[in-house]
Amino acid sequence: MATNKSCTAFDFNKMLDGVCTYVKGVQQYLTELETSTQGTVDLGTMFNLQFRMQILSQYMESVSNILTAVNTEMITMARAVKGS
């Protein structure tokens, strides 16, 4: 299957796969953290975790914005077809 880089072919499944992969990475990081520290965590480690969660939060916000824009465009197109 040819890869289409155009915004007209937004692949929601790839988007969700990306989120899932990132979350699995964070979960793996937490597992390693729990194993290696026996419950004691330094500030550098907490900063690293907070940074990863912030990236995930920003990504989810951008996905939400894309979905809102798609929804708005679909409503606009439906109204144009309907003639209202």
Curated annotation (Swiss-Prot):
<comment type="similarity">
    <text>Belongs to the chlamydial CPn_0710/CT_666/TC_0037 family.</text>
</comment>
<dbReference type="InterPro" id="IPR035365">
    <property type="entry name" value="DUF5407"/>
</dbReference>
<dbReference type="Pfam" id="PF17401">
    <property type="entry name" value="DUF5407"/>
</dbReference>
<protein>
    <recommendedName>
        <fullName>Uncharacterized protein CPn_0710/CP_0036/CPj0710/CpB0737</fullName>
    </recommendedName>
</protein>
